[in-house]
Amino acid sequence: MAPLGFDTTLTSAGDALIALSGELDLSGAGPLDEEIDRLASEDGVRRVVLDLRELEFMDSSGLRLVALAERRLGAAGRELVLVRGPEAVQRVFEITRMEDHLTFVDEPDGDGAAA
């Protein structure tokens, strides 16, 4: 399995698209959390879109990061949107019932924003 990698793209619509790859676990959660924290206070960002399509694995550290990111972004007047990941990743959200409380889309739109 691969360590967490991520690439952030800012769109003209005010979305920050973070494309994730590899494993979202304790070792990779810190740098991603710092990036989300930075985006929560950046002017012009209205939504943070986490693209989970290339994520291979996610543990409870990843779930915690997503839950805290949603809270932090909401407090800053921003929205968190998740692009659905592979079945194994989505299953973690289903089992914990977090899927009922988060915004998921199937893919980002053409500008990189959430559809």
Identify the meaning behind each predicted range:
Residues 59:
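Conserved G/P- and acidic residue-centered "switch" motifs that form tight phosphate/ATP-binding loops
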Residues 1-56, 68-115:
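STAS-like cytosolic regulatory interaction modules
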